[in-house]
């Protein structure tokens, strides 16, 4: 079990590093964010199953619901930005730029 949790924590760290490195494009940021949410889901499910917290088994499902909402809003924002500007740069979202 410890090797599995280390691998999942490493996957979260790699997704976070990808989010920090490739933050200029919206599509890569959304993919890294989904990787982070998936690793958080798997880690929370493993912790709940190993510690036998049967009353809190709704937590991973709730995390999946929020991840699905985040993905839908992110993809809608990506389509809107790419239709308006033709690019998926995050800097296009700043309306205060000249």
From Swiss-Prot:
Keywords: Electron transport, Membrane, Mitochondrion, Mitochondrion inner membrane, NAD, Respiratory chain, Translocase, Transmembrane, Transmembrane helix, Transport, Ubiquinone
Originating gene: MT-ND4L
Coarse class of the protein's main subcellular location: mitochondrion
Reaction(s) the record says it catalyses: a ubiquinone + NADH + 5 H(+)(in) = a ubiquinol + NAD(+) + 4 H(+)(out)
Any GO CC annotation of this UniProt entry: respiratory chain complex I
Listed InterPro entries: NADH_UbQ_OxRdtase_chain4L/K, NUOK/Mnh_C1-like
Membrane-spanning intervals of the chain: 2-22, 29-49, 61-81
Protein name (record): NADH-ubiquinone oxidoreductase chain 4L
GO biological processes: ATP synthesis coupled electron transport
Subcellular location per the Swiss-Prot or TrEMBL entry: Mitochondrion inner membrane
One matching Pfam family: Oxidored_q2
Enzyme class: translocase
This enzyme's EC code(s): 7.1.1.2
Job of this protein: Core subunit of the mitochondrial membrane respiratory chain NADH dehydrogenase (Complex I) which catalyzes electron transfer from NADH through the respiratory chain, using ubiquinone as an electron acceptor. Part of the enzyme membrane arm which is embedded in the lipid bilayer and involved in proton translocation.
Quaternary assembly: Core subunit of respiratory chain NADH dehydrogenase (Complex I) which is composed of 45 different subunits.
GO molecular function: NADH dehydrogenase (ubiquinone) activity
Record's keyword annotation contains Cytoplasm: no
Superkingdom, taxonomy of origin: Eukaryota
Signal peptide: none
Annotated membrane topology: Multi-pass membrane protein
Membership in a protein family: Belongs to the complex I subunit 4L family.
Keyword Transport: yes
